[in-house]
Amino acid sequence: MHAQFGFLFVIGLRLRRTHNLEINRSKVELALEREGREFSKTHPRSKKMFERARKSMIGGVPMNWMVEWPGAFPIFVTRARGSRVVDVDGRSYVDFCLGDTGAMFGHGPEATVRAATAQMRRGITTMLPTEDSIWVGEELARRFGLPYWQVAMTATDANRFALRMAREATGRRKVLVFNGCYHGTVDEALVRLVDGRVMPREGSMPPPVDPEVTTKVVEFNHLAALETALSPRDVAAVLMEPAMTNCGIILASDGYLDGVRELTQRTGTVWIIDETHTWCAGPGGYTRAYGLKPDMITLGKPVAGGLPAAAFGLSQELYEKNIGNMLAETTGVNGLGGTLTGNALALAAMRATLEKVITAKAYRHMVPLAKKFDADVEGAIHDYGLPWHSIRLGSRVEYRFRAAPPRNGTEAIAAKDPLLNKYVHLYDLNRGILLTPFHNMALMSPYTTRKDVDLHANVFRDSIQEILG
């Protein structure tokens, strides 16, 4: 492992089993019903707001993911600061979800708030650059090792633009992603592998083009499958997280990412690393922590402290393949950016966040807490003899209801247990803890405390005791 930031021990994983106990599924169902009643009883204002919202908002929320939380309705928030969220019923929560990484460095970090507030008074958007944009480009180049950068509004946009540039550079149309991935609402990446066929992701709206025309899908950690897929030399780009996170954490096997680099270079394929979630590995993301050499990097979510902003960077070689000239000299519609992209407010927030929030000091606080969170969960799993596991990537921790960590998306998807998942999340929610609703993921922020981690450890043990056979 290349340790760009020596204080980080990026990955933590232990498998300690003495014996297995069975979870009593009937007890889980009864406990879930009880927790559901308690939730509805203690959140009357959120319930009332949800009923009102359903009359004007599709699904009763401004974005459909917000109904993924446990309970009959989402909690409505009045404020969020640091590692705390307070709802309209006056209940306070320790937040380990942190906006599903958008607030990975805390809600409303002071430096970001000050910079954004000051910039709003000076002007929000002009479709002209500010000095902040220069600083941000230089800082991203320093951190991630790629020399040229552009700004986007979301990581979805950054991924979409990166794929467009890869197609321009290679003259190829297809892209390759990994089963179980998520790279935003990019049509080519909202796919899954079903009996060897590329299909639309379950639950997604139909894409405009058959995904088998645009996309190849292989399993993570399977170099032979990747080699077969790339060998026709018809793939413009491999888009991937260096460790999968959106179906739970899946770590790369030893030598796997080196193999990906070798195969993409050999076949003339652009290697794009999506660091949006794996930025948890260190100030320069997984790329710098492990000394990776991608052709492009995309990132978003926490880069502006939670304000809509993202970025993508490219190598000198890719820049010189007419891409740089195309961007520098072409005006009008080239398929990259939008009217509000690179606005002054976003760049001011990005600069403040990069300079004063996403710092080495922050990781020195976050990573040890993640290690403790991971150890507490694994300790409980061991003590109760459950066939579960916990895994850590930097400041991110995940636990699953399966004995061994999955090696790919198919194994991760097969390990899902919706009943247990909903029970654990609702049990936590009723006791003042927010986990990421899509899976059992927790993030530590610079504001997270040891007391917060201890609270989760105790509640986690209590939740297990109530459902043992």
Role assignments for model-derived ranges:
Residues 1-2, 21:
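Accessible peptide chain termini
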Residues 5, 14-15:
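N-terminal regions of proteins, emphasizing targeting and processing segments when present
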Residues 15, 19-469:
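Conserved N-terminal phosphate-binding loop of PLP-dependent enzymes in the Aspartate aminotransferase
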